[in-house]
Each structure stands twice: as structure tokens, then as C-alpha cells.
Amino acid sequence: MIEAAAYILIGGQSRRFGSPKWKARIGNETVLNRILYSCKEFETQQLVGKYRPSKYKVPFIQDKHKIQAPIIGLHTALQQSKHDWNLIISCDLPLMTNSIMDRLWGKRKTGSDVIIPVVNDMLQTTCAFYHRKLLDLCKAGIQNNMLSLNDLVRASTYIEVDFSDQTDAFLNMNTKEDLVSIKKKLL
């Protein structure tokens, strides 16, 4: 069991994708179901977004900010969380696995604020553990219109975890073409 909360970001306008990404299907399951399965070891799982998805019994937190940015979802999650550590994961990572979650969780250290995967020298900010003590820094970023999660991470004490051996798990699904490519990886 991972003694943390998993917050799945389902918001976003999905302009390039054309419809809510969490509804996209891979085989006989939705992308959201795949993400929920990858988070099955967490004490709690919650969805964060503008609108509650129908047909899901997973607890939902409505994001009330008008701004569309992952830092808004992080802020909403940290405000609600009763856990010190909180996974923030975007619903556009349909190849994510629970073994990656376990590996990340195993790297936490006292005094750190963020445990973050790195793939091809890029921080994977929408699949990382954030400590609840970042709430004030997150709030200040939003108030100052500094909405970059990369900037937030770099302003904190963070642990990088190299996932160059599992780059496919971090393939981001932004377009229908991305979805086709991801489906091909599963064949």
C-alpha cells in the first residue's frame, strides 16, 4: 500500500484532442480506467477537474479556478489532501503502470518536497509526488501568474528518478494521432 493520495487530473480543454481525453478508449477500457488501475495501491484516489465524470464512483473534487493549467489541479489537490504525499497524474498518460508508482514512492526522503520522474532530461511534472507543504508555494505561483509546474519543482527540494528505461510509459496523449500511436505500442 502506498500511504499517499492519488489525484488524477481530468480537467483541461482537450482542444488538440477534440474531446475529453479521459473518455478515450484503448481496447475495451477508458484511459481513465487505465490510470485508476495504475493508482490502485494508493490509500485514496480522487479525480480533479471542472466537471464530474458520469458513471464513476471515484471521489471528485471540482476545480473552481478559471485558469487551465496543471498547477491549478495541484493546488486544488493539496488544499483538500489529508496526506503528506500526493501523486498528481494527468489523464493523458495511458501507459502508466503501478510498478512505476512503486518505484517513485520508494525514492522519497525526509526533507524532500517532490519526487519526480525524468525522461530524456525532462521533468515529468504531471506524474509526480508532491508534498503537502508545497501548498503555499503553489498558491503564490498562481497569485503571481507563474503557472509552470517546472518552475514550482525547481523552486523546491526535489528528487529526480531516472526512467530512461521506461520512456513509453510517459508518452503523452495530446492528439488522436498520439492515441493511435499508443494503441500500436500495446499490440
Sequence positions of predicted segments:
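Nucleotide and nucleotide-moiety/phosphate-recognizing core
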Residues: 1-146, 151-170, 176-177, 183-187
